[in-house]
Curated annotation (Swiss-Prot):
GO biological process: translation
PROSITE patterns: RIBOSOMAL_L5
Molecular function per GO: rRNA binding; structural constituent of ribosome; tRNA binding
Keywords, in A-Z order: Ribonucleoprotein, Ribosomal protein, RNA-binding, rRNA-binding, tRNA-binding
NCBIfam families from the UniProt entry: PRK00010.1 (NF000585)
Lineage, uppermost ranks: Bacteria, Pseudomonadati, Pseudomonadota, Gammaproteobacteria, Cellvibrionales
Domain of life (superkingdom): Bacteria
Pfam family, one: Ribosomal_L5_C
Subunit organization: Part of the 50S ribosomal subunit; part of the 5S rRNA/L5/L18/L25 subcomplex. Contacts the 5S rRNA and the P site tRNA. Forms a bridge to the 30S subunit in the 70S ribosome.
Family statement drawn from the similarity comment of this UniProt entry: Belongs to the universal ribosomal protein uL5 family.
Species assigned in the record: Cellvibrio japonicus (strain Ueda107) (Pseudomonas fluorescens subsp. cellulosa)
Official protein name in the record: Large ribosomal subunit protein uL5
Function description: This is one of the proteins that bind and probably mediate the attachment of the 5S RNA into the large ribosomal subunit, where it forms part of the central protuberance. In the 70S ribosome it contacts protein S13 of the 30S subunit (bridge B1b), connecting the 2 subunits; this bridge is implicated in subunit movement. Contacts the P site tRNA; the 5S rRNA and some of its associated proteins might help stabilize positioning of ribosome-bound tRNAs.
Gene Ontology cellular component list: ribonucleoprotein complex; ribosome
Length: 179
């Protein structure tokens, strides 16, 4: 069992139940999935760029990646309907907790000029999204083999009903929020 999953079931869930004043353990917010998305607009001109992005995301997530395709043609961006323009991966269960552990303990502290995560990055329903400007903050990515720096989006979906519940959940996992 993943370290954070064990921590959640044994310590965090009972503590959150008491802190949030919930009657049942099943009401306690929990993380359901983590989605990592990498938009690669340059893939329109060069297919090798998308291959490198997919390989980076496979190393970061540890599982197979889905290539996302454009839904409609946009002349201004020079893309057509169905062209590959990015990649994403959805992590659940143990892989999700292992990724979250690496994100909190290793990747976030390696961000340059990091002063804490803004607590305003919640969507109003307890889900949290953050953008990472460089994929090299993850230890799985070898800096010498990177063709170019790419950003990625990390979306943490929770069962929390409000932003306060979601913030309490992520704070319990030692997320480095500002203030």
């Amino acid at each position: 069992m993943a370290r954070l999953k064990e921590l959640y079931t044994k310590e965090l869930a009972p503590k959150l139940k008491e802190e949030l004043g919930l009657a049942n353990v099943m009401e306690v917010p929990r993380i359901t999935k983590i989605t990592i998305n990498m938009g690669v607009g340059e893939a329109v001109g060069d297919k090798k760029v998308l291959e490198n992005a997919v390989n980076d995301l496979v190393k970061i997530a540890g599982q197979k990646v889905v290539v996302t395709k454009s839904r409609k043609s946009i002349a201004g961006f020079k893309i057509r309907d169905g062209w590959p323009i990015g990649c994403k991966v959805t992590l659940r269960k143990d892989r999700m907790y292992e990724f979250l552990d690496r994100l909190i303990a290793v990747a976030i502290p390696r961000i340059r000029d990091f002063r804490g995560i803004s607590p305003k990055q919640f969507d109003g329903r307890g889900n949290f999204s953050m953008g990472v400007t460089e994929q090299i903050i993850f230890p799985e990515i070898d800096y010498d083999k990177v063709d170019r720096l790419r950003g990625l989006d990390i979306c943490i979906t929770t069962t929390a009903r409000t932003d306060e519940e979601g913030r309490a959940l992520l704070k319990a996992f030692n997320f480095p929020f500002k203030g």
